[in-house]
Design a protein with these regions (language model features):
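C-terminal accessory segments of extracellular proteins
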Residues: 216-224
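Alpha-amylase-like alpha-glycosidases and glucanotransferases acting on alpha-linked glucans and related
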Residues: 1-178, 182-189, 200-211
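Glycine/aspartate-rich loop-and-adjacent alpha/beta segment that forms the canonical ThDP
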Residues: 192-194
Length: 224
């Protein structure tokens, strides 16, 4: 790809930029290092980490597409170089509240100090994504001690837990907030979009069939 000036990426991102105001690139870590697997291997177990030409790629992207807006999906266990690459180009990363809130696996103990999600300005905040439980489902799955701590943390806000987290997200310092429809409607896990690592029903089957509740929620959001 580097030999032809990253034509694949320039064409792909350039076309997407005609359709969308902002483009999220998943698995951003692969622009730092990627897992190379021999074509003869039946699984992905055998392979090696290869350093990617991330800086050369993004230099080319911004030279040819200077007005493009990109979000870097920077979740998971990352080496520092991934974040350095992200920050070099001032790309907003992702913050998901469900990952920011500390959970006690056994439900015991109390927080030693008030919790605060690390939502910084140059990031995009989510209550959850398509791969998460809905906020209502996630809260229901927490142990009592964690539920109590979350309730204390969200005390300044009103409504369902999902509505409270939405208010927190909208009032944070982030550049963008992305809210799943299921959280806007305070739906439980029966409306979950996807369970990573699984196939078949009910993944990707949920549909919004009635806009009336959503329209009511939009009016409420305007007051927040």
């Amino acid at each position: 790809m580097e030999k032809d000036g990253f034509k694949f990426w320039i064409d792909r991102l350039g076309f997407n930029a005609t359709l969308f105001d902002v483009i999220r690139i998943d698995h951003f870590r692969a622009f730092d290092t990627y897992w190379k697997i021999p074509a003869t291997c039946p699984t992905a177990v055998e392979g090696a980490w290869i350093e990617a030409p991330g800086y050369a790629l993004f230099d080319t992207i911004y030279k040819q597409l200077p007005n493009i807006n990109i979000i870097a999906e920077d979740l998971g266990d990352l080496r520092p170089q991934v974040l350095q690459l992200r920050d070099h180009y001032k790309l907003p990363g992702m913050k998901i509240f469900q990952f920011e809130f500390p959970i006690y696996p056994d439900g015991s103990g109390r927080m030693p100090k008030p919790i605060s999600p690390t939502f910084v300005e140059n990031s995009v905040a989510y209550t959850g994504t398509h791969d998460n439980q809905t906020t209502m489902g996630w809260f229901a799955s927490l142990k009592a001690a964690s539920q109590e701590q979350l309730a204390i943390f969200l005390k300044p806000f009103t409504g369902t837990v999902a509505e409270q987290l939405i208010q927190l997200t909208l009032q944070s310092a982030v550049k963008f907030a992305i809210l799943p429809m299921q959280d806007l409607l305070s739906l439980d896990d029966t409306a979950r979009m996807n369970v990573p690592g699984t196939i078949g029903s009910p993944n990707w089957e949920w549909k919004l069939k009635d806009f009336s509740a959503f329209e009511t929620m939009i009016k409420k959001i305007k007051t927040w």
